[in-house]
Amino acid sequence: MSIEVDWGAATSGPDGEALAERIRSFIHDKFQQVALPRFIRSVQVHSFDFGTIPPELEIKDLCEPFADFYEEDEDDEASDVSEGLVSRHGSPWHGTHPELNESSFRDDNAINHSLRDPFTEGFQPSALRSPIALSDHLNPHFRSGTPGIPGGTSTLGYHLMSLGGLSGTQTPLAAVAGGSPFAGGWNDSGMMGPGNRGRPPPPIFTAHQSRPEADIDSSNPTSRPSTSSTLPSHPSGSNKNNGDGAGGPDHGSHPEEHGHLDDPTSEEPLRFPRMRERRPEDFQVLCHAKYAGDVRLSLTAEILLDYPMPSFVGLPLKLNVTGITFDGVAVVAYIRKRVHFCFLSSEDADALIGSDQPDVGAQTEYSRSGGDATVSAKRQGGLLQEIRVESEIGRKEDGKQVLKNVGKVERFVLAQVRRIFEEELVYPSFWTFLV
């Protein structure tokens, strides 16, 4: 189903101007964080304009919002009571089952001294563990993990990897789209004892934040983050106070690692973010978006000339983005008084709505405009396919420019525009608007 957008009403007026200024300021701030090459001194973003050509939207599906959209922000001004905060698995255990935290469920720990009491003051849950929180309350001896294998051999641990830093083929969106309770990890808040109830959660990376480039192997786009540095959970047979050596083959083999884990002052422990409660009126729209408009972005970059000496003089290069060609899948989720917006990568879009057949005519036109002929122009989630730009360098004298079209600077600036767009607007990153 296709829909029409009143582009003029949506992008004009005081609200439209304020949104354009926020986008300009956001892109400008991102450029200040970029490591510039030696021949560029600075990059400034001066203006942003939405243009007059609206995008073409076709609704593909209506579904439940992604689990990441329910994460509670640290700076959120909304009341915790009104938002109905619940644990990561979506069940308000703290409010409806207070008896699960009573001491009657902790008395059995005296039977086996090698088991670490999960309700002691110094215990902090691991980022990866077997997802049996309710059984931990009812029977602490149930989790008898395999010695030497942190967290046991349960394959459910695969679903507990945080999705906040993965995208494309690394994101199991089939589970996320269905609102799977394992989509964003498991909350161990239900195991917190009375001494830990009033302790506020420390900051944690959420889906709003992008991954540092240093954590990603750019040479291998399908590589996953290494799990060698992940903090393991304590096996049920290991305890720092157990001196019989029966805690598994890794007991005592890494004393510095165990000392690091048992020292609460060594590093701030990770905790899962709080989640808002799902409501029946929450919904999400997946739509195929096409755009070949006249959005404008004005930038200036100062180029350094090294003759006759290094950084001898700087020349201002003005770049005007006069339009873009876009083809992707947009996600719009409405949750209470918030609208969450993002785009999907090509792999995630194919997994959710399927891939369309390539358009030969569009692919030919894209190749003529300078795009890669081996890449289909109708890549679902391909996002920015073309950026049209005009450049001027130096001051104009008698209507003539000093130089024209400095290719290196153009390629660098446009590559950064693409990177900022895809890192900040492609799931798991998203923008939230209050309505």
Curated annotation (Swiss-Prot):
Keywords: Endoplasmic reticulum, Lipid transport, Lipid-binding, Membrane, Mitochondrion, Mitochondrion outer membrane, Transport. InterPro entries: Mdm12 (IPR027532), MMM1_dom (IPR019411), SMP_LBD (IPR031468). Residues 1-435 form the SMP-LTD domain. Residues 73-113, 186-268 are annotated as: Disordered. Pfam families: MMM1 (PF10296). Residues 96-113, 251-268 have a biased composition (Basic and acidic residues). Component of the ER-mitochondria encounter structure (ERMES) or MDM complex, composed of mmm1, mdm10, mdm12 and mdm34. A mmm1 homodimer associates with one molecule of mdm12 on each side in a pairwise head-to-tail manner, and the SMP-LTD domains of mmm1 and mdm12 generate a continuous hydrophobic tunnel for phospholipid trafficking. HAMAP family: Mdm12. Belongs to the MDM12 family. The SMP-LTD domain is a barrel-like domain that can bind various types of glycerophospholipids in its interior and mediate their transfer between two adjacent bilayers. Component of the ERMES/MDM complex, which serves as a molecular tether to connect the endoplasmic reticulum (ER) and mitochondria. Components of this complex are involved in the control of mitochondrial shape and protein biogenesis, and function in nonvesicular lipid trafficking between the ER and mitochondria. Mdm12 is required for the interaction of the ER-resident membrane protein mmm1 and the outer mitochondrial membrane-resident beta-barrel protein mdm10. This is Mitochondrial distribution and morphology protein 12. It comes from Aspergillus niger (strain ATCC MYA-4892 / CBS 513.88 / FGSC A1513).
